[in-house]
């Protein structure tokens, strides 16, 4: 009986170590990035996302299919938070933390803010969407190897939120 219990504990220990190893391995290939920008009247924006690499793959339309909800990053769902009421794109957003999802298209993408945060990146629940809107996707001549978000503080207290990966760029103004 003691021998069986010891074997069970050893197997459980090995499984736990394997799961932590896999998690560490995947995170090292898509590192976590955190961004912060400040606008007017105490507006602060924070973004946290994991940055996958192209690795000689075709991204949009293949690895990330068109017209399918995407977690907009790797690993955990990307999050964005706002410290006060503001405009994200042309939509009003109340203060809070949201998960950021997208539906890529060749010419236009749907941007989604979802009220659920903290989930693994594939657990999307449409019933918890806070808002959706479309933005134009711009093709770039320069290839971006690793998914890159930027928060750029502009004049008149605007903040530009950009997404670049492969040869695609999205621009969402925030104020």
Regions found by a protein language model. Give the residues of each.
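Hydrophobic membrane-insertion alpha-helices, especially the h-region
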Residues: 6-21
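Mid-length scaffold segments of soluble, non-membrane domains
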Residues: 72-118
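Surface-exposed, gly/pro-biased binding rims or lids
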Residues: 118-158
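Aromatic-capped interface at the extracytoplasmic side
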Residues: 19-35
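Short extracytoplasmic
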Residues: 39-66
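Edge beta-strands of extracellular beta-sandwich domains
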Residues: 171-175
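Short, exposed beta-strand-loop hairpins at the edges of beta-sheets
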Residues: 158-166
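Structural motif
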Residues: 40-41, 88-89, 165
């Amino acid at each position: 009986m003691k021998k069986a219990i010891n074997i069970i504990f050893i197997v459980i220990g090995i499984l736990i170590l394997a799961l932590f190893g896999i998690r560490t391995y995947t995170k090292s290939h898509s590192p976590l990035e955190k961004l912060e920008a400040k606008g007017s009247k105490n507006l602060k924006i924070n973004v946290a996302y994991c940055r996958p690499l192209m690795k000689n793959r075709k991204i949009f339309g293949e690895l990330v299919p068109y017209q399918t909800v995407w977690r907009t990053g790797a690993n955990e769902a990307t999050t964005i938070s706002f410290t006060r009421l503001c405009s994200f794109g042309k939509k009003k957003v109340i203060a809070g933390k949201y998960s950021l999802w997208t539906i890529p298209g060749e010419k236009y993408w749907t941007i989604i803010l979802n009220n659920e945060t903290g989930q693994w990146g594939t657990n999307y629940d449409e019933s918890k969407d806070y808002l959706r809107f479309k933005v134009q996707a711009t093709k770039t001549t320069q290839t971006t190897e690793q998914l890159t978000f930027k928060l750029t503080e502009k004049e008149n207290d605007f903040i530009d939120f950009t997404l670049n990966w492969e040869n695609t760029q999205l621009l969402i103004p925030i104020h």
